[in-house]
Amino acid sequence: MKIIHANRFGEGKNLVIIHGFLGMGDNWKSLGKKWADNGFCVHLLDMRNHGRSFHSDEFNYQVMTQDVINYLIDQKIESCCIIGHSMGGKVAMQLA
């Protein structure tokens, strides 16, 4: 099982941020650091075929949703808030 790349900042309640198409977690770094300063453990994900995550010929919402689930399991995250932008928003809705 491949795990997507993520940067993590802060401590507290988990906040997972999923970027939009052609983006990466770093696009959310400024806001992520502010939320981290306000009591969140912020996870800035790089989805497959984006940023520093692995590349794959398989690319659809079902596998991206499973990638996030695999990340949450790997990080032992049982509860979190999720923010998704554009493509990431659709992944977030499928996680709900």
Please state what every model-predicted region is:
Residues 7-54:
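Conserved HGGG/HGGXW glycine-rich cap/lid loop of the alpha/beta-hydrolase fold
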Residues 43, 47-83:
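Active-site loop/oxyanion-hole signature of alpha/beta-hydrolase fold enzymes
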Residues 35, 95-96:
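Aromatic pocket-lining residues of Rossmann-like dinucleotide-binding sites
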Residues 30, 94-95:
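Active-site signature of alpha/beta-hydrolase-fold catalytic machinery across serine-
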Residues 1-3:
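N-terminal cap/lid segment of alpha/beta-hydrolase-fold proteins
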